[in-house]
């Protein structure tokens, strides 16, 4: 059985940067906290916890120590609270997310009503929204955009892991809602390239394996776009979840991984597939 790994599977620039900053912070003396999971990989979060990094939902009673800001960013209020408490802040926010936050703030200050295209429940979006100083709403789809009221000036940004097609459809609806529209395409290039690679690979294989946390938006989207072309698509977090029955009648299997998936997890999955293949042929 041939195993084909997508070229850009695994850590993107922002995640690689964030994990490196987190592990460096964990090695220093003193209390270290992560304001939310550093990335959407339970396995990486567990390794940091073993090094003493405690994941927090909020700053609460924390009065000292180092706070690591996750790659998805946090709200402006949380960041201000950390500064007010004079905590040491290691800001591991992805630069692409940071740019979206800045765009929202600038649009808002310029008098635009802001539309954020994305998942309202995602921490990245909640952080981006917090930088608006005026009216702001989150739109997840073309249908939701159609329900927006008329507005004079609309400013649009996107969650970095959104698909370009969804952004395009929302923008087209917004054109019907306002006379003046300003758009910032804040979708990360790595997200678009990964999706293009994954769909190209899904067309040529008999089975697709997508590796990544079940709480990872970009991994979920990878699995969705692959499943549209290859029904035998399976999302997993670890090699232990692989079912040998998935590979019955399979000559070629494609493997890709979300932006928060470490290389060692990808290697374990590929090794497990090889073991299953060897057992079939022995």
Curated annotation (Swiss-Prot):
Any single GO BP term: terpenoid biosynthetic process
Active-site residues annotated for this sequence: 124 (proton donor)
Keyword Oxidoreductase: yes
Signal peptide coordinates: none
Annotated (2E)-4-hydroxy-3-methylbut-2-enyl diphosphate binding sites: 40, 72, 122, 160, 216, 218, 260
UniProt feature coiled coil, ranges: none
EC number, as in UniProt: 1.17.7.4
Functional pathway: Isoprenoid biosynthesis; dimethylallyl diphosphate biosynthesis; dimethylallyl diphosphate from (2E)-4-hydroxy-3-methylbutenyl diphosphate: step 1/1; Isoprenoid biosynthesis; isopentenyl diphosphate biosynthesis via DXP pathway; isopentenyl diphosphate from 1-deoxy-D-xylulose 5-phosphate: step 6/6
Annotated positions binding [4Fe-4S] cluster: 12, 94, 188
Binding positions for isopentenyl diphosphate per the UniProt entry: 40, 72, 122, 216, 218, 260
Binding-site residues, dimethylallyl diphosphate: 40, 72, 122, 216, 218, 260
Co-factor note (free text): Binds 1 [4Fe-4S] cluster per subunit.
Pfam families assigned to the protein according to its UniProt record, in alphabetical order: LYTB
Reactions it catalyzes: isopentenyl diphosphate + 2 oxidized [2Fe-2S]-[ferredoxin] + H2O = (2E)-4-hydroxy-3-methylbut-2-enyl diphosphate + 2 reduced [2Fe-2S]-[ferredoxin] + 2 H(+); dimethylallyl diphosphate + 2 oxidized [2Fe-2S]-[ferredoxin] + H2O = (2E)-4-hydroxy-3-methylbut-2-enyl diphosphate + 2 reduced [2Fe-2S]-[ferredoxin] + 2 H(+)
InterPro entries hit by this protein: LytB/IspH
HAMAP family on file: IspH
Its job: Catalyzes the conversion of 1-hydroxy-2-methyl-2-(E)-butenyl 4-diphosphate (HMBPP) into a mixture of isopentenyl diphosphate (IPP) and dimethylallyl diphosphate (DMAPP). Acts in the terminal step of the DOXP/MEP pathway for isoprenoid precursor biosynthesis.
Family from the record: Belongs to the IspH family.
Name used for this protein in its record: 4-hydroxy-3-methylbut-2-enyl diphosphate reductase
Organism of provenance: Geobacter metallireducens (strain ATCC 53774 / DSM 7210 / GS-15)
High-level lineage: Bacteria, Pseudomonadati, Thermodesulfobacteriota, Desulfuromonadia, Geobacterales
């Amino acid at each position: 059985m041939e195993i084909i790994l997508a070229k850009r599977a695994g850590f993107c620039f922002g995640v690689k940067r964030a994990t490196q900053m987190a592990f460096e912070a964990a090695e220093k003396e003193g209390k270290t906290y992560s304001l939310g999971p550093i990335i959407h990989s339970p396995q990486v979060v567990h390794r940091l916890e073993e090094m003493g990094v405690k994941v927090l939902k909020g700053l609460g009673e924390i009065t000292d120590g180092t706070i690591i800001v996750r790659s998805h960013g946090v709200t402006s209020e949380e960041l201000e609270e950390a500064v007010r408490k004079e905590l040491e802040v290691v800001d591991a926010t992805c630069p692409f997310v940071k740019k979206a936050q800045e765009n929202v703030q600038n649009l808002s200050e310029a008098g635009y009503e802001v539309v954020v295209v994305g998942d309202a429940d995602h921490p990245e979006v909640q952080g981006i929204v917090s930088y608006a100083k005026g009216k702001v709403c989150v739109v997840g789809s073309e249908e939701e955009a159609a329900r927006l009221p008329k507005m004079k000036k609309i400013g649009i940004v996107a969650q970095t892991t959104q698909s370009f097609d969804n952004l395009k459809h929302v923008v087209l609806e917004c054109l019907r809602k306002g006379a003046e529209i300003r758009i910032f395409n804040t979708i990360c290039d790595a997200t678009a390239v990964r999706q293009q690679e994954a769909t190209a690979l899904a067309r040529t294989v008999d089975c697709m394996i997508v590796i990544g946390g079940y709480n990872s938006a970009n991994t979920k989207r990878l699995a969705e776009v692959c499943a549209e072309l290859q029904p035998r698509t399976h999302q997993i977090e670890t090699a232990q979840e692989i079912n040998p029955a998935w590979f019955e009648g399979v000559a070629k299997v494609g493997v890709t991984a979300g932006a928060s998936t470490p290389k060692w997890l990808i290697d374990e999955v590929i090794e497990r597939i090889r073991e299953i293949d060897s057992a079939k042929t022995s």
